[in-house]
Amino acid sequence: MKKIYLFSALIIVALSSCNTLKLMVDNDYSYETDFTKYKTYNFLNCEIDTSFVCSEIQDAIRRQMKARGYKVVADGPGLLVSYSIIRDRVDYKGYFQPSLDRWVNHFDGDDTYKTQNFHFGGGMILVSLLDAESSRLIWRGYASGVFNKQVNKPINYYRSVVRNIFDQYPLFAAGEKPRKIEEL
């Protein structure tokens, strides 16, 4: 009898894990940017949001920026952070390029943008970093499939999505060194 309960429990766990879909996470950045000069940031306004997703995402971004040593300032930030919540299918032309840390630390003049078309379903969260002085987009990270109806959304789901996006941004604020999360 115990074997039947154990087998049933294993089947339930296996079926519930099928309910969680993998998110597609990627990023794009500007080759013309000196990422090592930024220390501070502030947010641009989010779209009007009645579901509190916007505030959850902003809080998650704030945590990720703090973990990388960036400071929020009201006046004269180096970076402006923007984020978009897209609930529909997204089709756009993007670029294949070397990883950001490789570009910053090991510039190779032969590295070039290679265009490619992207088609994403299930909605998307898009995080953009802009140079505050020029308003130029310097980095954009995204996760698609975020609003797919089959995705199981546990507590802190959006925090996890934003963390996965920022895993694509391995840089720290000017003068900062990587440190453990406990030090925050």
Model features per residue range: what roles?
Residues 40-92:
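N-terminal segment of the mature soluble domain
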Residues 1-4:
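Positively charged n-region of N-terminal signal peptides that target proteins for export
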Residues 6-10:
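Sec-dependent N-terminal signal peptides
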